[in-house]
Amino acid sequence: MKIGIIGAMEEEVTLLRDKIEKRQTISLGGCEIYTGQLNGTEVALLKSGIGKVAAALGATLLLEHCKPDVIINTGSAGGLAPTLKVGDIVVSDEARYHDADVTAFGYEYGQLPGCPAGFKADDKLIAAAEACIAELNLNAVRGLIVSGDAFINGSVGLAKIRHNFPQAIAVEMEATAIAHVCHNFNVPFVVVRAISDVADQQSHLSFDEFLAVAAKQSSLMVESLVQKLAHG
């Protein structure tokens, strides 16, 4: 099995990249892909850049050039579920855009024409992630993750997301674009991220302070998940 892993920022991939053995680097379209073995399992780790376009471009390049069997999206996220704290884990069962609006033509809010309203994560990947969470004794929430090209740190943006997606557990800037590409390629995906901030008016300060904590927790989870998928 070859496992594709996608993170947006340097801080979100560096811990995993440093553990890849026999590492080779591929630079394509502004993205970097690191291939090799993580604890004996073949992986391709993508640093995509921030935002939906960068994530979709990178995911497409990763799928075309490296042909992974599954995709794990890692990194940080802003917490929406009330129980979440910095360092806690969120696992997607679905991903949706929070900044797409074609409702004038009868689509659901967040749905694009020709696409489902939401992109469902793979049940087996979710189960494997939840098994890892239990083994690592981490706090985690599973549910809807929403994405858009905005860092949410104000009451207006937060209120809009809560109104349109009251069930959402976390918000970030890439996951749904990656899920969209995986849907088109028919490749299973799951989003496994760690909370860096709570999406409020101070979230930009929290993000800067706690990004390293989130990166460490999400990398720990991904490393465990890779082992679980490869060896059961």
UniProtKB/Swiss-Prot annotation:
Q: What does this protein do?
A: Catalyzes the irreversible cleavage of the glycosidic bond in both 5'-methylthioadenosine (MTA) and S-adenosylhomocysteine (SAH/AdoHcy) to adenine and the corresponding thioribose, 5'-methylthioribose and S-ribosylhomocysteine, respectively. Also cleaves 5'-deoxyadenosine, a toxic by-product of radical S-adenosylmethionine (SAM) enzymes, into 5-deoxyribose and adenine. Thus, is required for in vivo function of the radical SAM enzymes biotin synthase and lipoic acid synthase, that are inhibited by 5'-deoxyadenosine accumulation.
Q: What is this protein called?
A: 5'-methylthioadenosine/S-adenosylhomocysteine nucleosidase
- Give the enzyme class: hydrolase
Q: Origin, by domain of life?
A: Bacteria
- Recorded catalytic activity of this chain's protein: S-adenosyl-L-homocysteine + H2O = S-(5-deoxy-D-ribos-5-yl)-L-homocysteine + adenine; S-methyl-5'-thioadenosine + H2O = 5-(methylsulfanyl)-D-ribose + adenine; 5'-deoxyadenosine + H2O = 5-deoxy-D-ribose + adenine
Q: Which PANTHER family match?
A: 5'-METHYLTHIOADENOSINE/S-ADENOSYLHOMOCYSTEINE NUCLEOSIDASE (PTHR46832), 5'-METHYLTHIOADENOSINE_S-ADENOSYLHOMOCYSTEINE NUCLEOSIDASE (PTHR46832:SF1)
UniProt source species = Escherichia coli O9:H4 (strain HS)
Question: Which CDD domains does the entry mention?
Answer: MTAN
Provide the E.C. number(s) assigned to this enzyme.
Answer: 3.2.2.9
Its Gene Ontology biological processes? L-methionine salvage from methylthioadenosine; L-methionine salvage from S-adenosylmethionine; purine deoxyribonucleoside catabolic process
Could you tell me which pathway this protein works in?
Answer: Amino-acid biosynthesis; L-methionine biosynthesis via salvage pathway; S-methyl-5-thio-alpha-D-ribose 1-phosphate from S-methyl-5'-thioadenosine (hydrolase route): step 1/2
Where's the active site on this chain?
Answer: E12 (proton acceptor), D197 (proton donor)
Give the keywords, sorted.
Amino-acid biosynthesis, Hydrolase, Methionine biosynthesis
